[in-house]
Amino acid sequence: MTEKKSFYITTSIPYANGAPHIGHAYEMMTTDALARFKALDGYDVLYVTGADEHGQKMLQTAEKQGKTVEQLAAENSKAFEDLSIALNCRFDDFVRTTEPRHKAVAQEVWRRMEAKGDIYLEKYSGWYSIRDEAYYDEKELSKQEDGAFIAPSGTPVEWMEEDSYFFKLSAYEDKLLALYSKHPEFVGPNTRRNEVESFVKNGLRDFSISRTTFNWGVPVPGNDAHVMYVWVDALTNYLTGAGFLSDDEKFEKYWPCDLHIIGKDILRFHAIYWPAMLMSADIELPKRVFGHGFINVDNEKMSKSVGNVIDPHDLIEKYGLDQMRYFFMREVPYGKDGSYSHKAFVNRTNADLANDLGNLASRSLSMIAKNCDGKLPKIENLTSEDDALVDLAESA
């Protein structure tokens, strides 16, 4: 018997400073659907998800809520894992970035990049968004009437100055462009690839990869005064889930990752920083990064201030799990933004599930009850036409 071909698929790992919403649920459900289809196609599928638990934003949220950061991480990571289970997502591993196995992976990748000569220590000064956990060039910012700058995401930024390790991202500009040219499928959909290529062609700057103003993170090897920038730590979770350092046989089987499913807002980290880091560490690159769109509510962006953030558990309870999974995968063009509303949900459920599929099932069962004594007919001999259909299905 021939061994099944492997297929490794991941969600991004959501940031554990808040509760999950329908945007997180959408990514979990669509990734699970893709994993199931690959399994039906005969692949040995590894589906990994998890939670990103480090960073300054976690510390600030824990302080506001009167909790320890460890408590916040444990509670919210469990909330994301519980949601994935409630959505009937058949994930194989849930990676928490506070786990010892992940710390070892992140530090090994750092050592390899450092050994390559791609990490150096220097004074950093620039604009930083705590909420985005991202640095921005001033030309990317918008200036408000009061003189304050805001990031492209609409979040406030503050001027940061501290000693920091830097990664030589600028050294990988040509290699990244060559990657996109040779493997245009690396970034999807096509509109996202164009965005990524345009960004890289405008010139890449080395980026800060450590912090000294707090200690909630993975310590930098050889210098405990620094912790890794949260994205350097978080991105390596995909290696952790594949068994890097902990299970050589598993890693050889499933790496490189076949498909990273992520939100379009974190495409830069996955399509630029991540492959550059892997090139530096001499680790094979993933095959594809796909950036899906956002889920809006009544065509408006979800916002706590507006009060339109939807708890996925409420939708499961109100409509049912199968209906919820069907709605989001049928209603939203994959790769583009979509919108949820009660009216759209009810209309889609009634039109497709109750009327079309429901009527088909009802009529089929009625015919079986009437003509086959209520039992499924047993297939005795296949015709040549039947054999042709079976062959076509097996070769698909």
Task: Name the predicted role of every residue range.
Residues T61-A74:
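A charged helix-plus-loop insertion that forms the helical arch/lid used to bind
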Residues K123-S125, Q144-G147:
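Short metal-coordination and nucleic-acid-contact micro-motifs, chiefly zinc-binding Cys/His arrays
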Residues T98-D118, Y128:
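Feature captures the FAD/FMN-dependent oxidoreductase FAD-binding
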Residues A51-K57:
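Short, charge-patterned binding micro-sites
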Residues A73-D92:
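A glycine-rich helix N-cap at a beta->alpha junction
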Residues T2-Y43, V48-T49, R101-V105, Y124, ...:
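Structured secondary-structure scaffolds
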Residues S129-D132, F149-S153:
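Short cysteine-rich clusters marking metal-coordination/redox-active sites
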Residues D52, C372-S395:
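Acidic, turn-prone loop/beta-hairpin segments
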